[in-house]
Amino acid sequence: MAVAGKRRYRSDARTEAAERTRSRVLEAGKFLFSRRGIDATTIAQIAERAGVSEPTVYAIVKSKAGLLHALMHDAIFGPRFKLAQQKLGGVEDAVRRIAMSAHVARAVYEGESAELSLLMKSSAFSPELRKIQQSFENLRREMQRERIDALFAAKRARKGLTKEAAATLLWMLTSRDVYHKLVHESGWKPERFQSWLEQTLIETLTETDWR
């Protein structure tokens, strides 16, 4: 028993050390990407700032694209998103699930803004960033499909709307561009964005005037 306990302790210690190293690499990448841009930053610079070797950086993230992907994943699918998904998972009504897409969208973009605002501004025209963003857009659309399927299965979709059109509208209305234009460019509070989006989704996609 004592031997097994020591092995578990060593395993836990190694896991914690690996997580700390990963965090240092990601923080170094975020700092340098934000100030120099993605394309101008090198793996050697990231390794130096993180206090690790270049092979260690490659072992953790494989490449700059892998590092960027990890940063965006952690920011977008962080605590805010997980809490929103938990709330969504507890709702069975198909129309209300559509409305709650506004809460999920706000959680995603608030998390992204808090963690990656400088990076997004400095690297807005990076081909690598555009490629990663597109992969997340595809994932976002795929994750929304279940809500659309449930809406049509419950026969509560807006009359004349096809399932594919509904999926496209949900994806478009909950996009980063809409959030950015309303919150960052027009000065809306995130609460106002969420309230507007809830009502817009209900009016656009369903036959129900749900409040």
Where are these regions (language model features)?
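Amphipathic alpha-helical linker/stalk segments
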Residues: 69-101
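Amphipathic alpha-helical packing segments from all-alpha helical-bundle domains
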Residues: 103, 107-120, 128-154, 164-168, ...
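Short loop-to-helix capping motifs
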Residues: 63, 112, 125-126, 176
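Basic, helix-initiating cap at the start of DNA-binding domains
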Residues: 1-66
